[in-house]
Amino acid sequence: SRDVVNIVRKIYKTKKVGHAGTLDPNATGVLPIAIGNATKIVEYIQSMGKCYVGEMTLGIETDTLDTEGTILKKETKVISKEDITKALKYFEKTYNSKEVYLDKNQFFEVIKEYDNKKISQIPPMYSALKKNGKRLYEYARLGIEVEREKREAEIYSLIILNFYDNKIRFEVNCSKGTYIRSLFNDIASDTDNFAYMSSLCRSKYGIFKIENAFSLERLKNFNENQLYNSLMKIEDVFEYERIDFDKKYFKHISNG
């Protein structure tokens, strides 16, 4: 996310650039960028809800809970529920070994415990959260694990989009401060499996939608007029009703 800010500074030729909501290195999607006076409303933007489409891969666990990390555990085979119903021996083999048993019904039951619920999460060690003035990932890179307090988050909706092989795709609508990597890890654990987040795309951040976003590659090819037109007005970010009033009341309203 910091790299994106630095690139935008060069494109728009200004130092006053900020962003809302850090994206993981392997994640794609919406990253709201604020330029000039708009940096004053970053805190407001960060309070908005988010929507992600993510993929969980069962049978692999990494130290970062995503594709960036070192593999800690790996299973050699994934057996689906359909395979098990075809032959009892597959069920027996799955039960007695560490191979992954993908029971779709079990996942749907577990999802109910997260859907439209407030949850508590322990932030992953590989995250930008600070502890004693240092980022957690800085401790993690030194092989130091520090105690992390649970953080509250809210899952507005959690939908399974599809199953394929040992992978499950989800759509998650959630509050700020939600760690999707940790969510996937918890869901897998609740089904007696382990997994990692194999892909993640933030499709929406408050009023900002991916279909209206500009890629860095596209911005780099914009002329000055196109760059200006790519920016939203600050007042358009706020989801408040517009009220027009007489000029004589301006001072009173400004002073509260």
Regions found by a protein language model. Give the residues of each.
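Catalytic/RNA-binding core of pseudouridine synthases
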Residues: 1-256
